[in-house]
Amino acid sequence: MFSKDGLNNLMQHAQKIQEQMKKIQQEVSEIEVTGESGAGAVKVTLIGSHYCKKIELDKNTILEHDKEILEDLITAAFNDAVRKISDLQKQKMSSISSEMKFSNNLNLPF
């Protein structure tokens, strides 16, 4: 059976983690990242919620590349930006993941 103090500590700990996760989610949603391809010829800027804010094309790229290559470059830049957001989310969430491992000082029977 849980002790009253142990259960209270567990609930406080869970609430603290939940608040930290909300804060991190808010921070990540406001982050801007730019993915690039073709040595910077194509740039895609996303915000943390994976919303595409801007696509930039180097004017020389438009003139030199055909439609299919340009589409591939845009796709690669977009995927690069999505990967960067994912990496940032993992990095920020790892800061609280260790707190999710409950320590012995919670007075829990397990």
Curated annotation (Swiss-Prot):
Disulfide bridges in this chain: none
UniProt feature coiled coil, ranges: none
Major location category of this protein: cytoplasm
InterPro entries attached to this UniProt entry: YbaB-like_sf, YbaB/EbfC
SUPFAM superfamilies in alphabetical order: YbaB-like
Keywords: Cytoplasm, DNA-binding
Gene Ontology terms, MF aspect: DNA binding
Pfam families per the UniProt record, alphabetical: YbaB_DNA_bd
Family: Belongs to the YbaB/EbfC family.
Function: Binds to DNA and alters its conformation. May be involved in regulation of gene expression, nucleoid organization and DNA protection.
Assembly with partners or alone: Homodimer.
Name of the protein in question: Nucleoid-associated protein bbp_426
Organism expressing this protein natively: Buchnera aphidicola subsp. Baizongia pistaciae (strain Bp)
Highest classification ranks of the organism: Bacteria, Pseudomonadati, Pseudomonadota, Gammaproteobacteria, Enterobacterales
